[in-house]
Amino acid sequence: MNDLRQQQMVAATSSSGSESGTAVESAAATSTAGSAGAAGRPQSNCSANSNAKSVAASSTSEEEQRVSSTSSPAQRDQQLNADRDREQEPEPQQQQQREEALQHQHNQPGHITSTTASPPPTLPPPTTPCDDAPSTTGASASASSASGEAPSAASAAGAAGGPMAATALEVESEERDGHKIILKLSKHANPNSNANESQPGGDERRVEPLRIQLPCGGAEGGLVAKQQDAFDADASSCSSSCAEDEVATTLGQQLRNTPHIVPKLTIRAANERRVGSVVPKLTIKLPENPAASGSNSNSGSCSAAVSGAQSAMPAKNDAHLSSLSPASASSSSASSSSSSSSSSSLAEMQTVPKLMIKTTLAGSSCISSSEELPQQQQQIPKLTIKTGGGGQEHVHTVIMTHDLNNAQSIPKLTIKTKSIEMIEDEQAAKLEQQLQPLPKLTIKNLCSPKHKVRAVLEEKPPTAASKLAIPKPTPNPTPAPMTNGGESNSSSQEFCGFSDPDADIAAPASDDVRRNSDDMVIDDSLSKEHDPKIFHNLPPMPASNGIASGGSKASKASKSAQSQHNVVDMVDLTSSPSPGSSPTHVPNNFTGRISPKGLLIDCLRMQTAIGCYVPEEADSRVRPAASPNSNILLSQLTAPAKSFTTTTPKSKSSKYPQLTERLMANGSGTGGGSVIAAESEAVVGPLPAANPAQSIIESIEILDTPDGSPRVAYMDEDSNPMLNKHLQTIHKLAMDHGVEQRMDTQDNNNENHLKRTNSEGNESPSSRLPPSKQRRLDNDENDQQTQNCHDPARKCSESLQALPPSHRSRKQKHERILNTDLEGSLFPPTQQQSISTPDQNGALSSEVEGEDAKAQDPLEPATPQPPPVATPAGTGKKRGRPKRIQNQSSPDGGGAVTPKPGTPQEEANSAVKSRRVQLLRKRLAIDMVSVGQEQADMKAKEKESSVGVPNARVEDGLAETLESPKTRDHRPLRATRRTTTSTNTNLQPTPKSTRKRQSKASVQQSQLPPPTMAQFGSSESESNNNNNSSISFALSAQIDLTMCSSSSSTSSGAAANQQVIGGSGSSSMLPPTTILSSSDPLPDVIFQPNDFSSIMATQQLRSSRPSSISCGSTGGSQPDCHDEDNYTSALDNSGDETALPMPPTRGRGRGRRSRGGRGRGSSSVDRAVSVGGTASTTPATQPRAPRMSRGASAVAKAIAMSRPRCVGGLKHQPDPERLKGLFSPSPQVFEEDTRMSADLSNSNQSMASLMEPPLTPQKQPDFLNNEESQSSMVSNVSMMDSNQGQSADAILGSALKRPKKKKMETCVAEDTDYSASSIAEYDWPPPKGCCPSKNRDTFMIQEQVALYLGITSFKRKYPDLPRRSVDMEERNWLQEKGLVSEKLCDLGITAVWASDILDIMYADFFDKYEEYKEYIRRKHLREIEAKQKALGLTVGAGRGLQARDRAMLSATKWNAYFNKSRKDERQSCMDLQTFTINQPQPRTAPTCTRLERSTSDLIRAVAEEANIPAPPNLLPPRDYDEAFRNSDYAYPLTVVPDQFSMAYRQFEPAELRAYPLDTALDKPPTDLMAQLLQAKSEAVGSDEIKTSAPAPKDLGQEQSAIKSVTVTAPVRRSRRSTRQQTDKVRTASSSSTSSAQSVSSASSGNGSSSDTESGDESDFSSTSSCSSSTGASSGAGSEDEDGNECSSSVRLSTCGVCLRSQHRNARDMPEAFIRCYTCRKRVHPSCVDMPPRMVGRVRNYNWQCAGCKCCIKCRSSQRPGKMLYCEQCDRGYHIYCLGLRTVPDGRWSCERCCFCMRCGATKPEGLPQVAALSQASGGPSANGDRSKAARNKRLKWVHEYRIDHVTKIREHAAMFCVPCARNKPAKRQSAAGAAGAAAVTPVLEATSAQTDDSPMPSPGLTTNGGRALSPTAALSPKAAVPVASLPPVLEATTVTTNIAGTIGRRQAGNAVNITTMQCSSSSSSNFSGNGVTEDAANVTATGTATAAAGAPAATPIGIAPPPVVA
């Protein structure tokens, strides 16, 4: 839902990521103008989850900002080339820079979908004094346009060869109120950074004009829904993941009671780096804000335009448009900063949408060799903020140098801020009206955590006041000074280590009201408080800032010189959720290369990752600084990219671009962001130039996803920025405590970092961020409006503040994706949790975090903590409080964590902040005790700086965030918010900011945990940070932070929802009073980390108020949650959901999940992710405490809803109606199907009901008096009756008092209306294990049914109805599921089978039955809809397509499978007219034309005439050919319409009369029948005669039999055979193989015929019954088969395997067919590898092929895998029919074949006589018969095998009992067998009787052939025959006896599976030599060795087929 919402918002405003991205890019482009094409390389982050690494190598004059996201190296190279090209031309003019920004844009491959011809890249029309000067955004702008309304071509930013011309982001303010940000994509012009030169008008890329009009009026309503770009989800994820991305511009954010929310526009460029891309023109029109002074946010946009030139980064085409180039990010940052340039406190400033441009191109190598620093391959774009103040131009240049060591480049950002007065001469007068804010440049180096970038604000307080104004000053790009101001905030914060959280926090304070726009996070505090533009450059600014404030001032001066460039407000176009992902994180805004390279180098030496404000050229040219920046950039990139927000508020804004944008729109100044940025810069500045050595940061993906978010890098980056700031501060300002603080801060940062890593799973940046936050907090104190960024404190402040916004924007994006939490937990450093948290929660947590991080970060011990404290209260506070860790204690400024967003104002308000913190603490009744020791330390410090302890900070942060960013205009609002913060009501207002809230919460949580761990343990600290940050932010943005925190914990789900809500709802602007009212006093709760993420584990404010604060932030956000839940309909049941938001009192204050005030929210949020957060939304006010905890009902509902009630085929879930009917109308809100939930929570609800006064008097109906009531009336009152509103006590009391008159099975008021929904249908027992439906029945409750049907006594009316009492377990289960009320359970419930009830209803109550059926149907549909809704909430834009593709793929697979099965298994089709089965020609048969067919027919005819064998490869005749030649097939059929028959037969009228076409008129002519019969017999005779050589007698008999057989049988059989042939043909080969042992027919001997006949008769009868064929005469048995062979004629005259005739088998030898009795298919025995001996036996019974084979005993062909096949006769038996457990190992022989060929014994022990003889001769003892029986299983038949000399098939030659095998001479075996045959006959007969007694059940008389003969009978008739036939066979065979082998095979018990036997024609072919194992494997079932062990089983029928034995 969050994603969807965000997308919707983006679509609406096109501003989600794109606006800010565009603004940033323009700013970057403008500032880049000085710095050649550094921005040209900005890469757009491809994936929302990818961290945008700001990798920029800043050329001497060129600044490169590169966000290395997931861009390919080639793209990076292209970007580098483009950057280098840009670097080549360093023209200082701002206009040129702006043009270059446009160039960069075109260079930058933006994934802009739609391209419209864009106006020529003319300099943005001179911005009206107030209006944002047109700012050109770099390619990132085009990238950011991806999802924007202007879907400019994905190729935005000329990803092609040349550096991308940054899109000019023109912010034309028609009036000061209106800010128009126009993103112009200019064609890639000369790589020159000069905007004018490099960007000819013709060069402009096509830009689709995107116009956003922001109403000037209502702060809450003012926010235009942000449209996310086409890639909004991606963009939002990217931007929110990267704070950098979020360049929430506070442009034009006037502190107003009703600030405008400027939609955040995220433009993502997916274009290939080199290809010029069309960047949509983004025009953001901000209606004039009431406060004129604040209205000049244009300067920021101008600045953005200036930096935009450089900011242009190639966007990665493949990447999502969501990311714009880092340059664009920087430009957006600049624009934010400029927007806040106007005096933040007094004048309400218009908020200028944050323009964020994300480039997907990986900026991993912003290696364009910089002219100045070729050694540093990677350039960091220089960010120059030029502030033209009255008569004074201040240029702040932030140069981000790539740390070659870190291998990351940081874009150089240049922000030119000209006060309106300072703008071009024409505009100078206009600009004069507004003070010139001194832009604060904060550059965060994500690359190197160790390096910090320092933002130096050259101008002192005066600029702070005019900061917002500055953006407008120059129509030329010159006014860009603030361009990156808002962004810089987040950047610097990131560098500082508190990252965007601080700035973000500050932003939230002012932003609170405006935070409605999901993606737009613009901190008013940024615009207000940061007079100096803090450029939160993600790329660590080169030490240039660190060089000397003088250098920074020089850069300012240079910028002033360049003041002509229009100030462009940077609008963060990237969605705030992923602050770090968007390229904006790496701002490429460089107003010019004015900053002297020396300065930049010095800065680099200082390793001030963030150059505060070095002269633009210096910054641009200082590439050495890039390396420190690189580290920071690495951190930033690794961490969620943070928008470069010049203004401190940007800390929040950068982190939460949406919030920042909103704040900007609502008028919150970017001042706070600027301050933070400055602070960050100051802190980072001191970093030595060593960073330059660091390698450019390779592209770091900023993942919006919780785990994906590059939090670690982010945290590191923050730390680095802090270090850089500290270094800079120390180096430049030589701040004594700066070094110490830096060291301490580094320690703190490290600790935080580690802690964060522990808590969040991210190590590196974690500590960095907190230091930044701390620094920022310190700077907040020191960095008042009056303080200059150059002042270390101010720098730190600005940097810190700027940092949090960046982080926030990214964080928000993550949160929107619900990744924030995971992100924080996974990448605590990346997210810079402490900073990020403050950003989310407000300045407080960010400040605290910053301090903590500093303290923890050993690298940043010297960071001046006080400046971080100076960070605006909102920013520092939120952050500071949670982040305030013991480690933080070292940084003094950390204590002063006061949010820095409004630093300029914050300074003034510093005292007020601490006082407000105290007041807020008092109001909220926050116990600071739980803050922790470090926080206590922080408390003192922060209290001083109005940051105080996390609680104080939260309060302070809220107050200050409100005050500092919005202090001037929104001060009361802030106070209210503070109040609100304490109050749960905050939740209600926050819904508007839900998404922001989520991202904030996640960011806060993620950020906070490490600092908190230091202080309270990461979870507590995070909780505090989240809460504080949430509070400040939620209060300022009124975002449901509770939801956020829960969402952060569940970062993947709820956060996104919340963000969405925030975006959609304007409730975030709810009056603080409401928020206050909503908070209920709740005990302080410590949030424990959520299951979803450690981030969630945050300590709630210590006191009930703190929990309230947490709740306040959470509460403030909770309404958001509610809204979010409502909007998101996260609750599956929206019906009750609405109620939840109503009672804010219910608020998160009561942590349901051990989350303290937020606990509920979090749990509810967690559940909200699943259930829509109803719990959190449910008002605490509701008296549902007795029920489950607040969230309980929602949880119960969720459980109940998730609980499938399957009754029969119907799923039964109680309806909302049912709920309403069953339960009292208590205020509790249930989800749709929560009736169960209500019931479910009966304990809770009933308690609630009891506790609540009855809403309506409950009648004591007569049912109480009913005589028939089953049980006591007391319990009779059920929760179901709660609907009547009478309390349970009253009911119970009345029940006791009233006499029982009637008995009713259910006691319910008579007037109660029971609907179908009241019937519980359930399955019992509940599903278990793998077979859920096993032993389950569907039941109903008799009492409920009786009530529904209106039956007084169901038992009496239906006495015979089966019923059962419900046991305790079932009753409890029913109650839990809410299916049965407690009252009913107490009365006693009876279960009846649902089927019976349905039958009764159908028979007797049809209307009720129909009603119930309809109810079930509708319920089922509702369930489906609910599931779809639940799925739809999280379904991304592409899911529909994915589903379609999956469906297509599934259909394709199924069709393929179906067709394959048709070809393989269902080949045949049956003609229903003739019942003729048509089969496809075998594949072996060549396809031929009719001509070939006729030719083959001719040849065949000639061959037959000449008695010549037909050629083997001759095509077989078609079936119809033979069919029409045979009587069977010659049945006339009418032709169906359109049926075509190629061959047909013409009947004569006389013939037709004999056929019953309609009615048979004549009898068939006798002559015709005779002819047919004769033809048949002749055909068969000739056929058989040809192949009868082996058995002439048999053939003769067969022929005679055929003649005697009536024709009907053959015809019928042949038809049946044809019908069955389909499957049989396929299986014939395998079956015959299994039956591959047979004795040649010749071996059957003379007596075989009679025996065969009798045997076959029995076989046939049984088989025929099996195959549904009637038995024939005894002679018909074998004769029938042959006769059928004849009748089948041509079609059946070929082998089913080789397709040859009988006289020619596969070996080209004549061979008689064997025919399957069932399918009539004929095969050559050799084709199925059937040995000759087996063939002889097969011919003696109705043999079936493998496909048709039926078990001889059960007559079933099912379960062929369980079938054993006799290796001698090929009969099949199921192992379970034989009593065997498994398939025997070796070969197996059936009972009929298991007899000794010498003695006729049917057991392997032999006959008793033989046993005695053998005993005498050493054989088995005679008296050992019983003992032998005991050893029976161990004895096995001895088999002899031989290889047939003709077929080479291994066949079974003989079987002997053990004594005979021992005694017989091997060579004389055959003779012995022959001699003993006569004697054996009686023995066999005797044995047959014994066999029946054998343990194994006899197969039955019918076992083998289905014979009905008794065993003796079966044996006796054939006894003589087998004996007679044996000798010849034995003689012919060479016997190889393998006793051991046979024994091994023979174990029937061990038989495993004989599946192979049935289907393998290879089994017999495998018979080789001994082949025992082979055979065992193949013929598993046939192992005869088992005969002994399984003898009982085999014996009974064993000898039945003696002929078979032969």
Curated annotation (Swiss-Prot):
Primary gene name: e(y)3
PROSITE patterns: ZF_PHD_1, ZF_PHD_2
Keyword Repressor: yes
Similarity comment: Belongs to the SAYP family.
GO BP annotations listed: chromatin remodeling; negative regulation of DNA-templated transcription; positive regulation of DNA-templated transcription
Region (Disordered): 1-208, 313-347, 458-564, 744-794, 821-916, 929-1029, 1044-1082, 1099-1196, 1579-1685, 1887-1911
Keyword Zinc applies: yes
Name of the protein this chain belongs to: Supporter of activation of yellow protein
Compositionally biased intervals (Basic residues): 1147-1158
CC terms in the record's Gene Ontology section: brahma complex; cytoplasm; euchromatin; heterochromatin; nucleus; polytene chromosome; polytene chromosome chromocenter
Domain comment as written in the entry: The PHD fingers mediate the transcription repression in heterochromatin. The SAY domain is essential for fly viability and transcription activation.
Ranges of compositional bias, category Pro residues: 118-128, 861-870
Expression across tissues: Widely expressed. Highly expressed in ovary. Expressed in nursing cells and growing oocytes at all stages of development and accumulates in mature oocytes. Expressed in the nuclei of syncytium blastoderm of early embryos and in the nuclei of different tissues of late embryos, larvae, and adults.
Function according to Swiss-Prot or TrEMBL: Essential transcription regulator during early development. Coactivates transcription of some euchromatin genes and repress transcription in of euchromatin genes translocated to heterochromatin.
Locations listed in the record: Nucleus; Cytoplasm; Chromosome
Region SAY: start-end pairs: 1340-1573
